[in-house]
Amino acid sequence: MDVPSSSNVTGRRKRQVLDDDEDDGFRSTPLRKVRGTKKIRPADVVPETIMTKIGAHIDDIVNKKKVGELNCFEYKSPLEIHTIEDMIKAKASIQEMAVVLEGAQCIIGYRVDRLHHDVRQIDSALSSGTVMRDSNGEEIHLTLESRKAKKKMAVVDGMNGMLDFLNNMDDALTTTELDADNDKNWKEDEENIAGEPRIDFKANSKDVDAFLQRDIFPEKLIYALSIKRATDLRADLLSDVSNYISADDTAHDLKDANIDWLRANPTFQKATKGSVCNSSNSFHSLNYYGIHSPDGRTLMLHNRIADKNADDRFFTSDVSVSLVKNTRALLTNSLDKKPRILDNYLMLEVKDRPVIGRYKIMSKDVKKSTLPLAESSREKDLANLTFAEMNHRPSNLDMTVAGASDMSMLPGNQGLPLAQGENDETIALDRLTPPLQSSVSQKASDEYVLPPLEANDLDEHLIGKLPIEPNEMDQTLANMFDKKLEVFNTSDTLESKVWKNGIRAEEWGEDDEAIMKNDTKHPRQAGIEGWIKATDAWTNYDVVKMNVNREARSQLDENAIDEQESYRNMVPEIGKNLFLVKSDDYMNNYPGDRPADFTVNDEVSDVMKMWSGEDSTAEDDVPLEQIQQEIREQVQQQDVDMEPIEEMDYDAGGAAFDVDFDDRLAAPVEVEEMEGDNNRNDGRVADILFNEQMDETEVEERNEQDVQRELEDIALAADEVAELMTSAPPPQLVGPSAEMREEIQNIGKNDNAHWVPPVVGDQERQAAVTAQRKRREKKAKSRKATVEDFVHYFRDIPDDEIEREITAAKCSKIADEKSTFLSEQQLYLPTLGIENKPHVAFEMGLLGNSGMFFKKSYGKIRLERVKNQKAEQDLFIDEARGNKDSDCLNWLLSFSGFRCMENPEPITGSDSDENLRTAVEQPFDDDFANDYYDEDRYDPNYEQQLAAAQMGPDMQRKLALTASHINQMFPNIHSKRYGGEYGDSDDEFDDSFDRQSIQAKNLDAAKHKKCLAEILKTDSLSMPSIQYVLEQLTSNQTLRMNNTTIRAADDRNETGRPATPTMEADKTLTSVFDYRSPNKSNHDVNETMKALTEMPDYQAADERPNNQPTTSTYGTANTENRKVHINGCHTLLSLALSMPSRMGETVRPSSIVSFLLHIANENNLQIVQDRSKRSWMSDFIVLNSSESLPRGLKMGRIEDQDEFWKRTQDPDAIEGTASDANNVFSNLMRRPKAVPVRKGRGAGGQPTTSDLGAIVEEEEMEE
């Protein structure tokens, strides 16, 4: 009995505990302090045995997930800590052994994955140009620098360095093999006694890795395998090196979580957005199909340099006699009617990688503890559940290394005894008869005699009979595995995996790549390429019209039948047909690569060296200026060498006829004239139209190189997509070329260009009448062109076009400009009439199945023809200047449908109309404008200035007043506070060409889209709510009624503000849309102002794992806002008012339009414009899908503006002329001019022209 302590005054007794100096193995477990005494029981003292140490180690590996690919070689395998013999002596149970094997499998799985990853990093490191080894040459792994490292090496130097590195590895391999042979010979001489090998009693104690090769540690094995793979790869590099490997560092610039597989997929070398821009965000539709070519414009898909060993699923060295015997013994027992109970028999269960195998502990499932194999054998083939088979399934390619002797690792004394012979490691079922307690005490060195073969007969229908001879056994088992693999490959599971997430991220199988190519071939050709070709053709081609009657149609049908084996020629329909002809004057204006992108880390790279190919003899000391001069001379020489194409001899066939087609788009003509056959006397069109010889009458063949050059200049590349992106802008010339200066001077004269003033339109109509009279006289003297003359247009269609036509149901309906016949409605806006023909207008809904805009069509977009800037190829790095519009957005903004006034800046000063009139500079005369554009410098934003200037003075005053109110409401929200969107600019137009350096900043797409989505979901930020607040602030009632803390205007402006809402204030947000809420009491000023001034903290919803890339802390750009439901009536102007304050930074209207189109595309939203107003392009409404217009919204009729459109000859033009273009716009926008203002410009007020005054009066009367 314990004696109470004398110091225990409370009567409590101390507990007796063991001293701290005692051995750890006898230390007691922690106990609760309770009253009274308690004796220590033997069960409380648990010594730390071998199995507890191993269990803790396995718990770190399996459950706590402390082991991964990075540290898998630092953690020891459980079998490396203690041998199986030690575990047997510690009386380990079969359950504990199962856990040990599971931990060993997990470690091996990570090591194999790390091995494959390191080997495949060899060729992926080629693109970065840097490959290094550890300072210690004996280290196993390669050290690969980050792909975002600086570029210090050209591609050729990187290739040579890589080959040298592999050669050194080959030398190390030879040395290792020689040393291994010497050690082996010495050991065999020592161990062989009387010609017989000595039995190794500890053969089973090594890690599973070691059973592939005896007497080799796992580290050496992994190193040897790496050397072997690298040697094979070196041979592939010498023979199959890709021509499209480039050294840029944008290989993994992917922003969509749905295509994360592309970052580490072993079948692609790299994937970029189609441009060598290092600072731009990419869009996944451009990245899906592969890498970019050296010129940066063409996305090309090609196979990665294949690791041939990656597809090896079966190693013959893994098949041994003991493995065959173990398999036979397990199958025999499991198929027996009364199988012997193998306590807690473990079945391999494949889980998610990188865990190769996981042993299922049957004892934890009481209901299935009896006869686990006998029950399952009645349902499915057990051959697929064997250890060997599970290690050779195609879905687990990395298991081959560990698949040699999994069964031989089972303990020999726990129901599965193993023989101790070096080549005989079989399971003896007869030895299961003794109870398990007696089997524990058996020695590991007991001899085992294989029972008679008759006792182990296998079910023939399962795997067939296995012969006794070892060689025949190996061959039979190999055939069995091959059959199982063939069945797996021919099943439907493979195809379903390919398209589960675009492409599965696991290791590719043998046929996966071919299946992917076959499935993506048709959508890629018919969808993307067709969309690009059709868009380019509809925008920039000339239109040729031809009537086809029944006789001509039947003749064409007969010709098609007489052609080759099948009806392969496409013929037009009966009636009027329109064809697109390539134009020499108007070509696609999609920007090419920007030379500034070749500047990395403020260091100009040598462009010639970067794409020098495989020629490693190029000089490294050639200055950049010399290379640029050589390029200029070559381009000039090519222009000189190009001989003009002579007109075709139409009289060669014996019959004289003229084809009278205009070289450019024809001027407006009468309707009856359009009904006839258009002819053309320019023979070059025949060659462009037919793309081949016409009746073999052309005198001289064109140079093939020149033809190829023209094709590259005309069309968009195959995989370039007109997608909205957020990247850097295209380069623009510092000064205009001769062609561009001539075009600027002759705007509205030579062609039916955009923004044609009424005066010029009258002159053009008069010229058109004269041209029509001349054409009639010429037609009367010549024979008209017939369908037979165009027979070469309906050529024999190549196979790739047939494939596109076959897959039309799955892909786009538009495949090729020469296999697509357009209707008149597709080319011309039906509301205008033929006489007021725009260049091209088409319905975006026709492209709905092309794969790009598959969720939402944005209505009609009118495309504008822009003359090709042939001097683009002369731009170099020192001439490039900053421009913050993105590539594709800039391309879309060149179309008039997206051309509107952006980012209006406030005009400070009095709000009265008289002061506003004096603050606006008066326009200058036309004569001065013509002289002004003769200078070497010009305004690159002339057309956008003209668009805003033609809004009219009344509209300008309204917008200026609104801007001043907004500036007074939010005095702290100014672009200077946030430093501008790009850090050094207060205005989006502050990108003058005379600025020396502008650092572009990537827009956070996810943040913008999330902010837009929240605004759209908030009714208090809708257009009526903001309009109501503006009205209250204007009448100065809000400060008195609600006692808000909004900062009031200055005293000098407060006196001039009217006491009641003015007409201009009412029109601030309703200049285009006339909307009045039925009940204004629903609008709360405090709530709206709080929402306007609130700056939410956009944080990520959940943390992403390290292996998943993300473009932003706010989520991914394309998956963040998939579900957006609009509350309220939101317009572009209301969004432009709300976003800057909530974002805490300057937001450009062009960015709002870009991201809003993305959200509309993802959520099937509507974008509505009121074209009855002349300023309809300055605003639009965003509505939910299938949602009707708001009740208080009044929409006009476009017919009310018919007279105005006819006078301007352009559906998108806005009132005004070119005479009041630049000064009004620059004052309204408050931006620095790109061109210095000449003295005297706007000094004297010029009266408005009579035509402009008439239009202004007409608008005032309407409103």
Swiss-Prot record:
Keywords: Cell cycle, Cell division, Chromosome, Coiled coil, DNA condensation, Meiosis, Mitosis, Nucleus. It is found in: Nucleus; Chromosome. The keyword Coiled coil applies. Disruption phenotype: Results in larval lethality in XX hermaphrodites; survivors exhibit shorter and stouter body morphology and are egg-laying defective. Male animals are viable. Higher percentage of spontaneous males through X chromosome non-disjunction. Disrupts protein stability of dpy-27. Disrupts localization of dpy-28 and of capg-1 to the hermaphrodite X-chromosome. RNAi-mediated knockdown results in chromosome segregation defects in mitosis and meiosis. In a sex-1 mutant background, leads to high embryonic lethality. Residues 1230-1241 have a biased composition (Basic residues). One of its GO terms (cellular component) is X chromosome. GO terms for biological process: cell division; chromosome condensation; dosage compensation by hypoactivation of X chromosome; meiotic chromosome segregation; meiotic sister chromatid segregation; mitotic sister chromatid segregation; negative regulation of gene expression. Residues 1-29, 1098-1118, 1225-1263 are annotated as: Disordered. Residues 691-725 form a coiled coil. The keyword ATP-binding does not apply. Residues 1-10, 1106-1118 have a biased composition (Polar residues). It comes from the Eukaryota. Expressed in embryos and in somatic and germline tissues in L4 stage larvae (at protein level). Required for both chromosome condensation and segregation and for X-chromosome dosage compensation depending on its binding partners. Member of the condensin I complex, a complex required for conversion of interphase chromatin into mitotic-like condense chromosomes and for proper chromosome segregation in mitosis and meiosis. As a member of the condensin I complex, further controls the crossover number and distribution in meiosis by restricting double strand break formation, probably by influencing higher-order chromosome structure. Component of the condensin I complex, which contains the mix-1/SMC2 and smc-4/SMC4 heterodimer, and three non SMC subunits that probably regulate the complex: dpy-26, capg-1 and dpy-28. Within the complex, interacts with dpy-28, mix-1, smc-4 and capg-1. Component of the dosage compensation complex, which consists of the condensin I-like components mix-1/SMC2 and dpy-27/SMC4, and the three non SMC subunits dpy-26, capg-1 and dpy-28. Within the complex, interacts with dpy-27, dpy-28, mix-1 and capg-1. The interaction with dpy-27 is required for dpy-27 protein stability. Interacts with smcl-1. This is Condensin complex subunit dpy-26.
